[in-house]
Amino acid sequence: MTEGNFVDYTKIYVSSGKGGKGSTHLHREKFIEKGGPDGGDGGRGGHVYLVGEKSLWTLFHLKFARHVKAGHGGDGGSSRSTGSDGEDKYIEVPLGTVVRDKETNEILFEITEHGEKRIIAEGGKGGLGNWHFRSSTNQTPRYSQPGLPAQEADIVLELKVLADVGLVGFPNAGKSTLLSVLTSAKPKIADYPFTTLKPNLGIVAYRDYQSFVIADIPGIIEGAAEGKGLGHYFLRHIERNSTLLFLVPADADDIKKEYDILLDELRRYNPEMLDKDRLIVVSKCDMLDEELQVEMKKQLDKDFAGIPYLFISSIAQQGLVELKDKLWAMLNVEA
């Protein structure tokens, strides 16, 4: 998906460098009639690496980098001199990048840590020079090894946002507003569906200089698991979150029904998502008088037995401290 500078999916072709060939040079020196072999080895071809970079949050910088090629190894020289190694290429990617084989769709590896470095195309080994092939029966071998060929790969890079908490809800549930009051993030906010067309991340400052990361996942609609709307482009970002915050507005026609639809979309996309911790948050509680809120709590106790829920108002700044406390406790249950 692409929106502005946010790109979370791209395809690139990578090629390492081929190894340099070994030399067949024979030693030549004044007054020495028959010099022995002194051909050096070829240099290694350049590798292509993927490197995790925490300051990146998009694959936009690779949008037009369709072909990344490392340098070839240099040929061996005389006096057993080894050829130069080919130039390595480093492709920086954001944390949470999944690397797939384009043809088979097999996951090759994932980049999840800053500075993590993985070879995606290994440079060819340099060939051996003729010096290695001298023997008692062949004092002047005139052959050497060629360098090994380069490796090529068509790969798919797919970004899955790394966050502790994922905000899940229908379009216009108030997720962007909640993110803006909990964090310093400034997501686009307006009163129409699909205001958010990319995941927005924010850092929630907690007590004693602690913090956690929360992601506003673009609004899910019924049928998202089958690709309706923007489908799996949104849903895959939720896979990384350890805790899911289901945000449902207090003025929803049926809070339980909205929650069930959201949960069913996650289940159909990936049943393992149901193993994550869940918190139901009823937003816009400033619209409720005290009596109505009491009645609603009674109904929620029946509908969501065993699942924690909270009432908040982002606009009125109600229940936000309790929300932070609850999320922190859920994220640090084993601490």
Curated annotation (Swiss-Prot):
* Ligand binding (Mg(2+)): 176, 196
InterPro entries, sorted: G_OBG, GTP-bd, GTP-bd_Obg/CgtA, GTP1-OBG_CS, GTP1_OBG_dom, GTP1_OBG_dom_sf, OBG_GTPase, P-loop_NTPase
Q: Could you tell me which species this protein originates from?
A: Flavobacterium psychrophilum (strain ATCC 49511 / DSM 21280 / CIP 103535 / JIP02/86)
What is this protein for, i.e. what is its function?
An essential GTPase which binds GTP, GDP and possibly (p)ppGpp with moderate affinity, with high nucleotide exchange rates and a fairly low GTP hydrolysis rate. Plays a role in control of the cell cycle, stress response, ribosome biogenesis and in those bacteria that undergo differentiation, in morphogenesis control.
Q: Which family does it belong to?
A: Belongs to the TRAFAC class OBG-HflX-like GTPase superfamily. OBG GTPase family.
Major subcellular site: cytoplasm
* Signal peptide annotation: none
Record's keyword terms, sorted = Cytoplasm, GTP-binding, Hydrolase, Magnesium, Metal-binding, Nucleotide-binding
* Keyword Secreted annotated: no
Q: Where in the cell is it found?
A: Cytoplasm
Entry GO terms, CC: cytoplasm
User: Entry's CDD domains?
Assistant: Obg
* OBG-type G domain ranges (all copies): 163-332
Subunit architecture? Monomer.
Q: Which domain of life is it from?
A: Bacteria
The name this protein carries in UniProt is GTPase Obg
EC main group: hydrolase
Q: Which Gene Ontology biological process is one annotated for this entry?
A: ribosome biogenesis
Q: What is its EC number?
A: 3.6.5.-
Required cofactor names:
Mg(2+)
One Gene Ontology molecular-function label? GTP binding
| Obg domain ranges (all copies) | 4-162
Report residues binding GTP: 169-176, 194-198, 216-219, 283-286, 313-315
